[in-house]
C-alpha cells in the first residue's frame, strides 16, 4: 500500500509516477474521501475536547456549590455527547475503510531507475550469459540436429501429460522414474545452493493461507481470480462462536500461488531488531495458479501450469540496503542457471510490465531452443515498504523507533521451467539427455538419461 502521507503531501507526483505504469489514479475520489476524513476527524476531536471540558466543568460547578439546575444543564449536554461521538467514530472508521480500499487497489510506485515503457517490448536487457558458442544473433549456437521440444524429449523419459489430464484436467503434469527424479534433483540442488552458499534459512510453510495474509502481501484483492479458493468439507460449515456465543466471521482460505506469501508474512505484525536485518528465507513449495486470462497460451507442456514447484528467495531488508539486496538476489538466481550451464539473459522490466507490488524488477529469461526464444524462469523484485505497510512489518532503527522494512522476493528458481530448460538444452541426437554435472550427485551418479 502506498504511503498515505505521501499522497496528502505530494499527490501530483504520485499521480505522475502511477501514470508511467499506465494507471490513472482516481484523484476526485481520493480528494472526496480525504476531505471527508479530515472533516470528520476534526469534528471528532472537537467533540472529544468538549466532552473533557464538560466533565471538568461539572466537577467545578459541584465543587463551588452551583445551583442544581445549572449543574443538570451541563450534565445533559455531557450525556448527549457519547451518542454523537459514537456516530462520528463510526463515520470516521467507514471513511478510513473506503480510503484503504482505494489505496489497496493502487500499485507500487516505480523506482527512479526503472525505464519508462508500456509493455514487455520496452524492457531493457542488462546482460546475457552463454555457456558455449553463440551464433550471429548472439544466441546459443544450434545443437547440430533437429531440436525437439521438452514434451517430445520428456515423454519417453517419464513425463506424462495424458495421465495428468485424466487425473486433473489441462495444465497439469505427471512424472515418473527418471523424470520425477530429475525434477526432485533440481529442487534439492537449488535449496542446497541457496542455504549452503547464499546464506538463506530454509523454511517449511503452509500451502493454505488466510485471506488476511494475502491482503498483506498484495495478492488480494487484485488477483483473487488467479487464486485457488479452498472449500472445507466435514463439519467446518457449522458457524463458529466466541465465548459469549456471538458468531465469528469466517475467514476465506486459499492455496498459495507462491511461497513469497508465507515467507514474507513471517514478519507480519512484528517489529524486528535492526541488528537482525537482513533476514534471508527460502522454501521449496508447490504453487497453485488458476491462470485466469491465459486461455490459449502455452497450452502444450509445462510452461504454464496450474500446479508447479518453485524455490523462493525472500529478504527482509533495511531500507538503506534494499537495492544492494536486490542485486545480490539477482546474482543468487543467476548462479543457479550458471551451474546448470543454461544460457540466460537478465532483463530490467519497464514501468508498464512490472508486478503490482514491485518498485523494481529484474526477470531472468532462459533460452529454449525448441521455441527459439527466451522464457522467464525467475523474477526478482524489491517491493520497498509496499507490502510492509499492508502487513505492519517494522524494525527498530538507530533511534529505537519503529520503521517499515523493505521486502524483496525472487524465484531461485521455478523448478518446472528449469526442467524444461534442461531437457531442451541438454538433449542429444539419440533422444537421451545429458545430466548437468552439478545435478549428477543428486541423480545417483547418472550422467545421461536414456529412453
Swiss-Prot record:
It holds the Pfam family tRNA-synt_2b. Its EC number is 6.1.1.11. ATP binds at residues 289-291, 376-379. It is found in: Cytoplasm. The keyword Flavoprotein does not apply. It catalyses: tRNA(Ser) + L-serine + ATP = L-seryl-tRNA(Ser) + AMP + diphosphate + H(+); tRNA(Sec) + L-serine + ATP = L-seryl-tRNA(Sec) + AMP + diphosphate + H(+). The keyword Glycoprotein does not apply. One of its GO terms (cellular component) is cytoplasm. It is an enzyme of class 6 (ligase). InterPro entries: aa-tRNA-synt_IIb, aa-tRNA-synth_II, aa-tRNA-synth_II/BPL/LPL, Ser-tRNA-ligase_type_1, Ser-tRNA-synth_1_N, SerRS_1_N_sf, SerRS_core, tRNA-bd_arm. GO terms for molecular function: ATP binding; serine-tRNA ligase activity. Catalyzes the attachment of serine to tRNA(Ser). Is also able to aminoacylate tRNA(Sec) with serine, to form the misacylated tRNA L-seryl-tRNA(Sec), which will be further converted into selenocysteinyl-tRNA(Sec). NCBIfam families: serS. Consists of two distinct domains, a catalytic core and a N-terminal extension that is involved in tRNA binding. Homodimer. The tRNA molecule binds across the dimer. Belongs to the class-II aminoacyl-tRNA synthetase family. Type-1 seryl-tRNA synthetase subfamily. This is Serine--tRNA ligase.
